[in-house]
Regions:
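Active-site neighborhoods of divalent-metal-dependent phosphate/nucleic-acid chemistry enzymes
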Residues: 73-110
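Acidic, PIN/NYN-like endoribonuclease modules and their adjacent C-terminal/linker elements
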Residues: 4, 74, 101, 106-134
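Short, well-structured alpha-helical segments
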Residues: 62-66, 81-82
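Short, well-structured N-terminal submotif of metal-dependent ribonuclease cores
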Residues: 1-40, 54-63
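Structured helix-beta-strand junction loops
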Residues: 34-36, 68-71, 90, 107, ...
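Short secondary-structure boundary segments
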Residues: 43-44, 97, 115-117
Length: 134
């Protein structure tokens, strides 16, 4: 297992909805909770998880994101915005994903993400919890 990860929204959303790959995400969350892996999350990622999961039940999603923020150390957008902007300028990538990438770079961590190809060709170590989208 990696020493440090910066988690993207896709794994957390998959875990919330028990999608394919949720078991792998659970293992990572467990490793972070037990202190075996240093976990980082950006505030932009928290925002994405909250609004996507909140489409079904806003209060449950709020509680879930609150727990996530207890599991992972939070990096603010302010901390990495310039690095995120440079990444967005150089690559065709979703705005939320650049904040995961910038957080991984800032914290010398592996970007933990899903199957989307936004992370391809970026100068950051990537680990995927699944190879196919849902």
């Amino acid at each position: 297992m990696d020493e440090a990860i910066a988690i993207d929204a896709e794994p957390l959303i998959a875990y919330y909805w028990d999608e394919p790959g949720a078991d792998a995400v659970e293992g990572v969350i467990d490793a972070v909770e037990r202190g075996h892996v240093q976990g980082w999350i950006n505030t932009v990622t928290c925002t994405e998880v909250r609004y996507v999961c909140g489409r079904d039940d806003p209060e449950t999603a709020r509680q879930y994101v609150s727990r996530i923020r207890n599991w992972f150390d939070v990096v603010t957008a302010e901390t990495v915005w310039e690095r995120a902007a440079a990444c967005k300028q150089a690559h065709r990538i979703a705005l939320g994903d650049v904040f995961t990438i910038a957080t991984a770079m800032e914290k010398d961590a592996v970007a933990y993400c899903g199957a989307d190809d936004d992370f391809n060709g970026i100068d950051v170590d990537v680990r995927r919890f699944r190879d196919d989208g849902v």
